[in-house]
Structure formats: structure tokens, C-alpha cells
From Swiss-Prot:
Taxonomic path: Eukaryota, Metazoa, Chordata, Craniata, Vertebrata
Record Pfam families: DUF2462
Organism expressing this protein natively: Pongo abelii (Sumatran orangutan)
Annotated segments matching region Disordered: 1-37
InterPro entries the UniProt entry points to: UPF0390
Family according to the record: Belongs to the UPF0390 family.
Function, as annotated: May have a potential role in hypercalcemia of malignancy.
Protein name: Leydig cell tumor 10 kDa protein homolog
UniProt superkingdom: Eukaryota
Basic residues bias (residue ranges): 28-37
Signal peptide feature range: none
Length: 99
């Protein structure tokens, strides 16, 4: 058996763009609901406001829960951040060290 790993891995040839789009069309219907974006400016503005309110409310609730949990625990609560969605990013580390 050879020592170490091969320098260049064998790869499949890349699909052409037309073949890739054709395979996407042949995949069939996708799961989940679809939201059709509104065309009227007022409705767009209302949806944007609604989304921002929902996000704000959710963040406030999460913050309150964390504060309540950390105040009732004898030692400090360690929060972990979700990993970034960038390619090649290292694993996420917590901003506070768990003890």
C-alpha cells in the first residue's frame, strides 16, 4: 500500500449548464408551501413590517428566556452561536467559555 494520500483525487466531469437546468426541471414538485411575492407597494410594505415585528418579538422572547435562565442558575450560562453559512468557515466557537 502506498504511503500518504494521493495528491489529486479523481473527479467526475462537471455538468454543462444546460444539463444542470434540465435535471432541475425533471426533478418534479418540491415539498413545502410557496409564497408568491405581492406586486402592490402597500402590501410589500406591510409584509416587511410584519416580518420585522415577528423577528423583533422572537428575539425579545429569546432574550427574556435566557436572562431568566441565567439568573436562576448558580453558574454562568454559556451561549453557543450557530455556525456561519460561509464555505470554508471554521467550526463555530462559543463567545463565553463554559465552566
Amino acid at each position: 500500500m502506498a504511503q500518504g494520500q494521493r495528491k489529486f483525487q479523481a473527479r467526475k466531469p462537471a455538468k454543462s449548464k444546460t444539463a444542470a437546468t434540465a435535471s432541475e426541471k425533471n426533478r418534479g414538485p418540491r415539498k413545502g408551501g410557496r409564497v408568491i411575492a405581492p406586486k402592490k407597494a402597500r402590501v410589500v410594505q406591510q409584509q416587511k413590517l410584519k416580518k420585522n415585528l415577528e423577528v423583533g418579538i422572537r428575539k425579545k422572547i429569546e432574550h427574556d428566556v435566557v436572562m431568566k435562565a441565567s439568573s436562576s442558575l448558580p453558574k454562568r450560562l454559556a451561549l453557543l452561536k450557530a455556525p456561519a453559512k460561509k464555505k470554508g468557515a471554521a467550526a463555530a466557537t462559543s463567545s463565553k467559555t463554559p465552566s
